[in-house]
Amino acid sequence: MKTILVTGCSSGFGREIARYFLERDWKVVATMRKPQEKLLPASDRLRIIELDVTDAASIDRVVAAAGPVDVPVNNAGIGMLNALEGTAMDSAREVFETNTLGTIAMTRALVPQMRERRDGVIVNVTSTVTLRPLHLLSVYTASKAAVNAFSDSLALELAPFDIRVRVVLPGRAPDTRFGENAKPRMAAGFPEAYAGIAKDVFAQWKQESTITRPMQVAEAVWLAATDPGSPAHMPAGDDAVALAAAG
C-alpha cells in the first residue's frame, strides 16, 4: 500500500486530494497548520499532522512521523493580490517563504528516502497564472513560476534515481480560500491609482463561468502519481485546460 503526503489539507485542493487518495485505498498523511480531525473521513489509513512548511523543525518532525512516503504533494500556499506598489516587502517574503521555499524545503527533506528506494513521484501544485499573466498577481505569479522552474530542473536531477517530478496547474478556483487568505496581505493598503484596474479585474472574474473544481485537481494529481507516462506539466480544470491548449 502506497503513501501520499499532502501539504495544505485544511481546505480546497489539499483536502480534496487527501480525500481522493483515501477513497482509493492509499495511506494518506494530511498536513495542515492547525490540524482538524473532522475535515476528512475517519480511517485507519489516515494521519493528520501539524505542519508549517516555513519551519524547518516542523518539517523534520513530519518527515520523521510520516515514515516512507511514495508521493509528496506540495500544495500548501498562500494568496497575494495587490499592485506591486501596495505590496509590503514582508508580505512578498511571506508569499515566497510558503509557496516557493516551503516547496523546496519539503522536497529536500523527502528526496533522500526516495533516492535510496529509487522510486517515487513528487507533485508540485502551482497555477495557470504562470501561463498567462494577470493583473495584480505579480508577486504570487513569480512565487509559482519559480516552482515550475524548480520542478523542471529537479526532474532532470532525480531521473537517474527513477524519481518523477510533475507539476499540476489549477485554474481559477473560487471555491478555495485564495481570496480569503490573500486579504491579510492586502490590508496594508491598496493603491488608489490602481482602483480602476482592480474594479475591471474583479468584474471580469465575476463574468467568467469556466473554473477549476477541487475534484479536477485531485484527478490530475492521481494521474501524476500513478501514470509514468503523464506529462511533466498538467493543467487541472476546464479553464486551465483551455488556457494551456491556447498556448
Locations of regions flagged by a protein language model:
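Substrate-binding pocket helix/loop in short-chain dehydrogenase/reductase
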Residues: A83-L84, S91-R93
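Residue(s) in the substrate-gating loop at a strand-loop-helix junction
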Residues: S127
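A short, exposed helix-loop element centered on a Lys and neighboring polar residues
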Residues: T107-R108, D152
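N-terminal Rossmann NAD(P)H-binding glycine-rich loop of SDR-like oxidoreductase domains
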Residues: S10, G14, A18
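Active-site loop immediately N-terminal to the catalytic Tyr-X3-Lys motif
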Residues: E85, R132-S138
